[in-house]
Amino acid sequence: NKDWAHMWIQEGIGTYAEALAHYELGGQAAYDRIISAHRRGIKYKKPMVGGEELSEDETYAMTDIYTKGSFFMHSLRFLLGDEIFFPTLKKLATDSAYTYDNFVTSKDVEQLFSKSANKDLKPFFDFYLRTTDVIDFTIKEVGYQQYQIRINNFFMPLPVEISTSKGKEKMIVGKEGIRIQSSFPPLVDPNGYYLKKVTLLP
């Protein structure tokens, strides 16, 4: 990576690789335990990318480059799907354009994944890397067994798993939100693919 400001690329992805190794050894449950531990370890004190020309000490004082860096890759994997995520991650790790002979920035990683996904991922990268925010979901009952789900601080269309009385389904939640039918309040992202808070409004 180019300088200390982008150390999450090395440290975060390396930490995520540990979760993948646990999956190979112990299956999905082992992977989930590691990812949950990484999520619990996030401090949310400073953005992972805090500016150019950071010192080594300043960078490594931000432990989120490990934990949040790993969870960011977990979220990105869900957002893109394995069929896009893993070939792109392999390219990042093996293509000479991104290896140690070159200076790689967060922007380079963003553009690589955006190209593979054929979509602009800048809002997603900015949210995870350059803020300490979590995705703010609200759920409001708007009629008999009718619920409105909105995202209040992130406006890129986002695939989200939602559990209702009919089962679990992946839906795209855009800036207008979505309305769903359920006999009980829906569960948003029950498997924890995103850093989030969920509020059930009165």
Show where each model-derived region lies.
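Catalytic-site signature segments of enzymes, centered on catalytic residues
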Residues: G50-Y66
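Beta-strand-rich binding/interaction modules
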Residues: L121-K122, I135, V142-Y193
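Active-site-adjacent bridging/hinge elements
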Residues: R40-E53
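Short, surface-exposed loop or secondary-structure junction motifs
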Residues: D32-I42
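Zinc-dependent metallopeptidase catalytic helix centered on the HExxH motif
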Residues: N1-D32
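Glycine/proline-rich low-complexity spacer/linker segments in large multi-domain proteins
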Residues: Y194-P202
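Amphipathic alpha-helical substructures
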Residues: A5, M62-Y147
